Every structure is written in structure tokens, then in C-alpha cells.
Amino acid sequence: MRIREGHLVGDVAGGPIRFRDRVLGYIGLTKPRVIELLLVTTIPAMLLADRGTVDPLLILNTLVGGLLAAAGANTLNCVADADIDKKMKRTERRALARATVPRSHALIFGLALSVLSFFWLWWTTNMLSAHLAGATIAFYVLIYTLVLKRRTSQNVVWGGAAGCMPVMIGWSAVTGTIQWPALVMFLIIFFWTPPHTWALAMRYKEDYEAAGVPMLPVVATERQVTKQILIYTWLTVAATLALALATGWLYAAVAIVAGTWFLAMAHQLYAGVRRGEPVKPLRLFLQSNNYLAVVFCALAVDSALALPTLFSV
């Protein structure tokens, strides 16, 4: 048995659940792949905040706190979504859908991780970072999961704000404040989330429809969805270029090249739908992960090298 995207892959034998399966179930609840992507954005934000001179211990402590916060939020999300996870093929093998972990135990686990993350960040970084993490968990679980997700096709637009917070937490851990580069990084991820998520939802439209989740591809035509994907992709790239005001030439060059590539894929998807051709939205979903990773890795290297900024702002 192995873990993939918060799922348990493999069969749990009948009868009592083995200890190993239970442990894998708890790990799966935290959605490790999602956490991995969130943490990829935290380190570059911290390096940019102090142009590469950040204390490695502070980075480690912030990552631990961020990991605990994301794991807690994801677990509580799984608890709230246990009913619809059973109805979707993409999620039917998650631990709660298969009863590998009791729902009450998962709730306690998620709450414990969330509380621990708050006090960890408070103790090792500062109060602002701790409060940002706590607010993110509350927003993701109470606003996105319990309210927006099942009620509006714009759920991922507003709910995606939670996924933007690691850059704010990372920045505030270093500076104790929130400044404009942190807000621009927030916008990069905020605008990136809809095309990333809607591309996946296009592939699993029937799943969301069966679960009663009004994702945009469920309630709108493919042409409308891909047009929205294109708009948000342009906004994403524009935000990455705006961040170049605070970086050196390396980040700016990578942002231009990667942005051109990301836009080309979004335009290709939109053009294919307009022509009535079969399209592969999952390709855009997967490559959007690579795009975000490349841009933020370039930011990390640019900041670590303390390259001279292109503009004085």
C-alpha cells in the first residue's frame, strides 16, 4: 500500500485494520503532495524578504509550523468532505471514505495539528505568523470547505486564498510585517489557483457532478471554463512580472520564459475547445504545478544569490 494525493492505494484486508494501514491513513489525510507544493512557495518568500541572509533555523521552524498547519487544515477538510469523497472516484480511496481511520479520530488529529501549528509558530517565529496560520486554517475549513465549496462555482477563486498564505507566513516570519512583495506573491498563487483547479475539474467533471459540488466545469460550458482559465493565466503571469520589481535579472528572465510557456498551454486549451477538438485539460493541471515550482525556485535562487534588483521601488 502507498499514498498518493491523500489517498490510500491498495486494498485493506477484511477484518481488523492493520497498524500500518492506520498510520498510512493518517498520513494520507494530511495530503502530503498538497503540503509539498505549499512549502515550495514558503522558502523563496523568506529568502526574498531578507535577500538570502535568513537564519536556516528560522526557515526550518517556519517550514515545520507551515507543515503542521497545512496538515491540520487538510485533515479537517477530509473530515468535512467525507460524505462527498465516497461519491467521487478520484477520492473514494481516501482514509475516511474507506473507514481506515474513524472520523472522530481524524477530527481530533486535525484539531491537534492545527493547535500545535499555532503555538509552534508563536514560539519559534512571531505572533503575526502564528495568527496568519490560525486564520488560514479557519478560513479553509469554515469558509471554503463548509460554505463555499458546495454553494458556488467560484469556490476555488475565493477559497484559494488559503493556499496563498504560506508566502505571507514565510515573509512575516522573517520581517514581522507584511509588505508589498508578499502581497504580490499572494496574488501570484491566488490567480494561479483557478486555472490549476478548473483544469483538474474538467477532467473529473462527472465526479464533481455526482457529488453535488458546483465546480465551474459542472455548471458552465467548456468554452466558458477555458476562457476563464485563460483570463486567470494572464493575471498569474502579470503578477509574476510585477514581482520582478523586487528581484534580480534571473527571476525576471525565468518569469518571462515560464510565463510565455504557461500562456501558450492555456491558449492551446482554449483554442482546442473553440475548434471542437478533444482536449487534455489534465496536461495543463500537471504542467501548472511545474510552472509554479519553476517560478518560485528561480525566485529562491535569485534571492539567495542576492542579485541586484532591477528597479528601485
Swiss-Prot record:
Single GO BP term: heme O biosynthetic process
Transmembrane segments: 34-54, 56-76, 105-125, 128-148, 152-172, 173-193, 243-263, 291-311
Pathway(s) annotated for this protein in UniProt: Porphyrin-containing compound metabolism; heme O biosynthesis; heme O from protoheme: step 1/1
CDD domains, per database record: PT_UbiA_Cox10
EC number: 2.5.1.141
Localization, UniProt: Cell membrane
Disulfide-bonded cysteines: none
Keywords: Cell membrane, Heme biosynthesis, Membrane, Transferase, Transmembrane, Transmembrane helix
Single GO MF annotation: protoheme IX farnesyltransferase activity
Family as reported in the entry's similarity comment: Belongs to the UbiA prenyltransferase family. Protoheme IX farnesyltransferase subfamily.
Protein name per UniProt: Protoheme IX farnesyltransferase
Gene source species: Mycolicibacterium vanbaalenii (strain DSM 7251 / JCM 13017 / BCRC 16820 / KCTC 9966 / NRRL B-24157 / PYR-1)
Origin organism lineage: Bacteria, Bacillati, Actinomycetota, Actinomycetes, Mycobacteriales
Gene name as annotated: ctaB
